Amino acid sequence: MQNHHHQQSSYGGGYPGQAYREQHPPPNPYGYGQPSPQPGYGAPPPHNGYATAVGIRPAAATYWKRGVQWKTAWYVIAFGAGRNASALESVKYAAADTCNTGMNQYQNPYSHGHQGGPPPPPTDPVAFGHGAPQGYSFQYSRCTGKRKALLIGINYFGQKGQLRGCINDVKNMSTYLNQNFGYAREDMVLLTDDQQNPMSQPTKANILRAMHWLVKDAQPNDSLFFHYSGHGGQTPDLDGDEEDGYDEVIYPVDFRQAGHIVDDEMHRIMVRPLRPGVRLTAIFDSCHSGSALDLPYIYSTQGILKEPNLAKEAGQGLLGVVSAYARGDMGGMVSTAVGFLKRATKGDEAYTRSKQTKTSPADVIMWSGSKDSQTSQDAQIAGQATGAMSWAFITALRKNPQQSYVQLLNSIRDELATKYSQKPQLSCSHPLGKH
């Protein structure tokens, strides 16, 4: 297995941002604060299934979507009413996708093969700029402090929609963090549904408890890491902060009894308490996860901030009007046009509200396996079940550990492009500088 001991830049994605302190990871000052659900978790790293998969593009044709098979059951159980795939597609997030602009990777200045590693981050507070609360600033983390990680993988054994690769995702990611970025085993909490200890099961209560542990007592220049592999979905938005009218949710192993966890709650627990200069890196390998932490700044593969773009919905709205006209349904024409105008107005208002209320003085970066409207896929790669997003993330970093955030987004998409339709997303709690 190849190890990369590089001095990582915290700005722009020296992922996960730590200035790796050569030979000695930092001591563990406080452990799991609730107390630890995993006493004695200091065993040797699990087998790294990626050792045989490095450099191999996803070649297997077998995959399972993380969410699509459970869609009807989820909405009946969790929301009280079913919603099928076609209805979900009709309200999909319509931000502009600049990935298909006709530019190849060599024309894209943010392509991981085109430029060197990112510059060091600014050391002083940085102004948010347009759209953020007046006078508000954030601060990048130097990532020289403590490191803590929470990794969750749920295969849903014995349940409808069982997955195969989520636990492997956690094992692979924890090994990668430990061997390449100095995350000590005693500073990681792993919640997977193959463990015997009840406190290590990924139940709703355990997940929420562990989220609180992750951010507890975080100080400037600390580096926190969160990884979720499992089912994701959407539920009607109740607080008006979602452009598409739906909140994103994740499903604990006991979601049928305890319910799901909404993005608003994850933001409240893991983002809102963070101080300036604290880094939180989050990975969501699940369906409909584009804005799973409710971070307000979403970036394209060109490094361009995505403003609300309702062009796709505009096209759908016009098609609806034309279709109604062809049927002679004048009432349908009016209803379709008015409905689109309402969605357009609500989308712009939600985006402005999100930027004003969900910004953070901390340094929060999130990669997700798909857009809010897409499914993520369970794959079979080099004989091992794994999440396509998790596999691509580690593979891209093994090939080039020195990448900016946007470069890494391009690298991940490149790894997935030949076999998978999902498009990983990059979102932040603050605007990215032009570096």
Curated annotation (Swiss-Prot):
Leading EC class: hydrolase
Bias (Pro residues) ranges: 36-46
UniProt-annotated catalytic positions: 231, 287
Gene Ontology cellular component annotations, sorted alphabetically: cytoplasm
Origin: domain of life: Eukaryota
The keyword Hydrolase is annotated on this UniProt entry: yes
Signal peptide: none
Keyword list, A-Z: Apoptosis, Hydrolase, Protease, Thiol protease, Zymogen
Region named Disordered: 1-46, 106-129
PANTHER family xrefs: METACASPASE-1, METACASPASE-4
Function statement: Involved in cell death (apoptosis).
Family, as annotated: Belongs to the peptidase C14B family.
Protein name per the record: Metacaspase-1A
Upper lineage: Eukaryota, Fungi, Dikarya, Ascomycota, Pezizomycotina
Gene: casA
